[in-house]
């Protein structure tokens, strides 16, 4: 199962490489939609079926509407593809080359170190499990851990959304 999650994570990174080197808004929306679907597949593969389904319904349902309106407003008669510009095509290939190099490095090295952020009392994160039946589901434990130990992350995410509202207002103010 972890090989499937690994392949999905490679597809996740490749979809965001395609998004970052987008030549036309249609392809950027396509990259984000594919990345959202693959990300939900990763969450489902790691045991969070409820969370993966909710993210799939909310994120992709809402974002498809937004992308539908934005591509209708910014549509072009002949949209520029990834291969029509040398700079965009080379940026796409450089991103794919870096991804392949990281995969080869992980396969050859065999281990990847994790960054420790110094959290104490990590035993609270352990899901209580028995023989084939868990007492607490992983996705619920992850949500409660986010609000318990990751309160700084929730505050940072809220502040980022608040600032992004003002950025969008400032960009669209003159129109």
Curated annotation (Swiss-Prot):
Reaction(s) catalysed by this chain's protein: a ubiquinone + NADH + 5 H(+)(in) = a ubiquinol + NAD(+) + 4 H(+)(out)
Enzyme Commission number: 7.1.1.2
GO terms under cellular component: mitochondrial membrane
Membrane topology according to the record: Multi-pass membrane protein
Enzyme category, top tier: translocase
Matching Pfam families: Oxidored_q3 (PF00499)
Transmembrane feature ranges: 1-21, 26-46, 47-67, 87-107, 152-172
Cystine pairs: none
Compartments in which it is found: Mitochondrion membrane
Gene Ontology MF terms in the entry: NADH dehydrogenase (ubiquinone) activity
UniProtKB keywords: Electron transport, Membrane, Mitochondrion, NAD, Respiratory chain, Translocase, Transmembrane, Transmembrane helix, Transport, Ubiquinone
Protein's job: Core subunit of the mitochondrial membrane respiratory chain NADH dehydrogenase (Complex I) that is believed to belong to the minimal assembly required for catalysis. Complex I functions in the transfer of electrons from NADH to the respiratory chain. The immediate electron acceptor for the enzyme is believed to be ubiquinone.
Family, per entry: Belongs to the complex I subunit 6 family.
Protein name: NADH-ubiquinone oxidoreductase chain 6
Organism: Dasypus novemcinctus (Nine-banded armadillo)
Gene behind this protein: MT-ND6
């Amino acid at each position: 199962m972890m090989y499937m999650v690994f392949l999905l994570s490679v597809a996740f990174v490749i979809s965001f490489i395609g998004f970052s080197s987008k030549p036309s808004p249609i392809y950027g929306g396509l990259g984000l939609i594919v990345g959202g679907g693959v990300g939900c597949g990763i969450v489902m593969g790691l045991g969070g079926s409820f969370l993966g389904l909710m993210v799939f319904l909310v994120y992709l349902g809402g974002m498809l509407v937004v992308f539908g309106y934005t591509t209708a407003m910014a549509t072009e008669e002949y949209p520029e593809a990834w291969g029509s510009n040398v700079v965009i095509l080379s940026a796409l290939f450089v991103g794919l080359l870096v991804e392949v190099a990281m995969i080869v490095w992980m396969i050859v090295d065999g281990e990847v170190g994790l960054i420790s952020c110094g959290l104490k009392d990590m035993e609270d994160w352990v899901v209580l499990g028995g023989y084939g039946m868990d007492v607490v589901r992983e996705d619920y434990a992850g949500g409660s851990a986010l609000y318990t130990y990751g309160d700084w992350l929730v505050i940072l995410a809220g502040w980022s959304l608040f600032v992004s509202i003002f950025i969008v207002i400032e960009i669209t103010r003159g129109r």
